[in-house]
Amino acid sequence: MTDTCLSRDLPDIADDLPFFTDCRRRLHRRPEEGWTEFESTWTVVSALKAMGCEVVTGADLIEPEAVMGRDAAKVEAAQRRALEAGVPEAFLTSLDGWTGAATTIDTGRPGPLTVFRFEIDCVCVSESLEPGRLPVDLGFASERPGLMHSCGHDMHAATGLTLARWVTANRDALCGRIRFVFQPAEEGVRGAKAMVARGLARGADYLWTQHITTSIHENEIFASAGGFLATEKIDISFHGSSEFGTAVTAAAHATLAMQAIPRHSEGASRICVGTLEADAEKARSRPTRRRHGCASKCAAPFRRWRTSCRRA
């Protein structure tokens, strides 16, 4: 017996794999970028309510003052698209322009508050429609050019819904409260802050996040106690005199120097300079300012476990 589970003799979650597959393919087919995930939110909320869960959405989920990187025009267009796709107008109105969802399942017994976080947004890339790819052959490839779940958030959201379904069915064997958070706008590190500011993680005894990967074997998981795939975005400005000397040279040197920073020997790290911008007005007048858009990502050391989950 642990502080969250009364018994280890519990049904195999593999029995819910058909539900998982259906959710994942539905989300993969209709990808939406950060802060525009209205169809995805409807899919999540509909599934949770079908389980009998009470769901939190809209301003009860998001702190507007903490929102970053939200394009109002894209949000408005996404709402119109969702309405055309069959999402009820009353539901869209209730969201008040905010995406994402959360639910807390109470077992009715004392125990910890365990929070699971799952992302729902996609990446702005086009999916290959070449025959031979599973999504193409089975008919669930992205229907939206320029948008794709290439980072696996369709599987993350489907995992969250499947786990919520299992917890709901087995709550009599569990203790405490289990909260499921379906986060919008994870790409670009934009959505989490607004949810944390609203209190979604407050009082949590355990906070779990997860990410799929192809670098480990079937039935194997790995875990880290913190910092895994942590990322940071940095904007750097270089200023100089508007003469034949140029800030571009300084920016270029900094770009190369960043790549020479030694990587951590016990983990994985990446540094990417994604944008370089100059404000030159004349060909002869060299840029006086150069702007860097940088991102860093790192993975802390982790442990591996084998699992006994059987295939469907």
Report the location of each language-model feature.
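Active-site beta-loop-alpha junctions enriched in small/polar residues
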Residues: E32, D60, E119-D121, A185, ...
